[in-house]
From Swiss-Prot:
This is Ribonuclease P protein component 2. Its main location: cytoplasm. GO terms for molecular function: ribonuclease P activity. It is found in: Cytoplasm.
Length: 130
């Protein structure tokens, strides 16, 4: 069995709160496609693998992304320059950046973190989350 990496060797992450401004609503699967295509257009395949955008949570119109710390500027610029999805105008606004999901939810999205914490605790009791 493989050992886990010590914290000093793990990849550092940042969490980005964003808002999608558009005439239509998008489901979570489409938001993943929007973000991936924005990063692919601006950075290419190699840049997308380095940025490593991962959608943590999305509720229309705002969401949370997890990103590699070193390539945060590439993500910011690629999301700002993305202006069209499926021939519809779209604008992605970055609300804020933090190093924890809890701070993103409370400071930028103004949502209490407690309901999410309770769900995680229930899953831990059922041994579904480690």
């Amino acid at each position: 069995m493989l050992k886990t990496l010590p914290p000093t060797l793990r990849e550092k992450k940042r969490y980005v709160a964003f808002e999608i401004i558009s005439e239509s609503e998008f489901p979570q699967k489409e938001v993943v496609g929007i973000i991936r295509s924005a990063v692919l257009i601006y950075c290419g395949i190699h840049g997308c693998s380095k940025v490593n955008p991962w959608l943590i949570d999305y509720r229309h119109p705002s969401g949370i992304l997890r990103v590699s710390r070193e390539y945060l500027d590439l993500l910011r610029s690629s999301l700002m320059l993305f202006d069209e999805y499926k021939r519809n105008p779209i604008n992605i606004r970055i609300i804020g950046v933090s190093n924890s999901v809890k701070h993103i939810r409370e400071k930028f999205l103004h949502v209490s973190h407690e309901p999410y914490y309770k769900v995680i605790q229930k899953l831990k009791k059922r041994n579904l989350v480690k």
